[in-house]
Structures are given as structure tokens and as C-alpha cells.
Amino acid sequence: MAENITMNVGEVLTTIIVKDSGGITVGAMRVNLFDVRLVSRLQEIAEFLRGFRPAGNGIERMMAMDVALEDKFCYLLGYDCRAELFGVLSPTSILPDGEMYTIRILQTIEENFADKIKERAEARAAVLDKYLQRYKK
């Protein structure tokens, strides 16, 4: 019989809660802000947004774009986030300040990603210094 070993990796996922100006939760997402591959997936979505021109007119075009963006966000976050993130607001919803919901989500992830990576790098440097001090003695 095989032995099972459990390894605890600490907190990996960050939950970002989306609220309206009245404080009502309208969406949420779980993202691993420590995943360095997140950057390449963010870049892929940015390229997709620049070049994507769905067929059709008016509402058909917006619906096609919504479906495509939902798929891209599932890929970005690594799970099916449709109900959680887009249950109230669709990806192409225009916010009161004129910005598209998709853009706001991407900006929030990007801003928080840089901070988390910096935190993790500082923590890693402290651990390495601690171990190096042992060998200097």
C-alpha cells in the first residue's frame, strides 16, 4: 500500500470581490497572483482584445464577444469563473465611468500581481539570507 504525504503550500489563491458603489457584491474571482505564467496569459488576453472583431451587428456581436471573453477569463484564472465573475455584469458591460468591465478586471489583476510578486521576492530573499548565514559560520 502506498503512503500518502501531504504538503502544505500556504495560501495560494487570492479572492478579489467586485462591488458596486453601494457596496453590493456583483462578482468575485479567485486568482493565483504568485503564478508567473499569469503574465503571459494576461498578455494573450490583451492581444486577443486588440485583434478580436466578432461577426454580426449590434447585440449579436456583443454576445459573441461576451462568450469569447468569458472563455478567455476561464483560461486566465484556471477555472470556470462564468457564474462567479459574470453572473451580474457581462464582460462587455460598460461601467458608469465609461470603462469596460473586462478592462477593469484586467487592471485589478495586473496591479495586485506586481505587489504580490514583490512581497514573495522579498520573503524568498529573507529565507535565502537566513540559510546562507548558517553556512558562513
Regions flagged by a language model, labelled:
Residues 81-137:
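C-terminal charged interaction modules
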